[in-house]
Amino acid sequence: MASYASEVKKELTSIEVHPEHAKAELAAFLRMNAVLSRHDGQMSLDIVTENPAIARRIFSLIKTAYGFDPQLIVTRKMKLKKNHQYLVRVAQMVSEIMADLEIYSPKKGFITGVPDKIKYSEQRSMSYLRGGFLASGSVNNPETSRYHLEIYCTYANHSQDLQEIMNKYFDLNAKVTARRSGSIVYLKEAEKIGDFLHVVGAVNAMLAFEDLRIMRDMRNSVNRLVNCDTANLRKTAGAAAKQVEDIELIDKKQGLEPLPEKLASLARFRLQHPELSLKELAEQVPDGPISKSGVNHRLKKLHEIAENLR
């Protein structure tokens, strides 16, 4: 069974985009996952993934943005012998693509942050976030786990740029923290995770997320009510047991007849009905109904008498 995160990514790979937005999404993929290699004396950009849908997505983005088909090489992992690896190799226009996507320039070298033309465009930022999530993002199943969505970045300034566009344009309250030779930008609030899914275009996943979140919150509310009721029942039962103990002591030491009639009446009724709450006692006592405070006052009197007899 596919994970929730896999279902989200599968939906994202089916979104059709304009060539300029394809470039923004591709810029995130290449910046976060590509390796610059040399084969047969020629430079290439290699992106490796185990997800066939993501491999097809990268292939499609390159074709949409630059008009040619990259190489797609499928290999089988040696250790497991059942999982395939997909290598998308860009072996032409490498320098032009890296310059166009602002991944590398002769003056600046490798550029690790989000390019300004993306950072200052809300529409391109949406596509860049989609590429970033597909490249190295994950989201927990809202039904079974704590709410958490994250995107891993190798470079701290890249995660800070992602945080900036997430908060500036989409009010996602994203946070950044250091993580294993890199950092992550993450969301913890259920509402903000739903908003992020909508921003990057995973509308069906967002609706499923909201349904699961609502069901989970309802279950939690019911559990809290049940726990509260159980605690109240225990409290009532404990108080009733102490009251019965007091009355039985009075009955054993001196009997109930010497008591004032109202106290004796309540004492006998409590012995007969140890399961009743204070409210129920007040409503059903033979000389009632009386107020809860009235019942409480009589029970305190009985307790004082029992204490004097101990």
Curated annotation (Swiss-Prot):
GO terms for biological process: cell division; regulation of sporulation. Residues 277-310 bind DNA. The keyword DNA-binding applies. It comes from the Bacteria. InterPro entries: Homing_endonucl, Sporu_reg_WhiA_N_dom, Sporulation_regulator_WhiA, Sporulation_regulator_WhiA_C, WhiA_LAGLIDADG_dom. Keywords: Cell cycle, Cell division, DNA-binding. One of its GO terms (molecular function) is DNA binding. Belongs to the WhiA family. NCBIfam families: DNA_bind_WhiA. Involved in cell division and chromosome segregation. HAMAP family: HTH_type_WhiA. This is Probable cell division protein WhiA. It comes from Lactobacillus delbrueckii subsp. bulgaricus (strain ATCC 11842 / DSM 20081 / BCRC 10696 / JCM 1002 / NBRC 13953 / NCIMB 11778 / NCTC 12712 / WDCM 00102 / Lb 14).
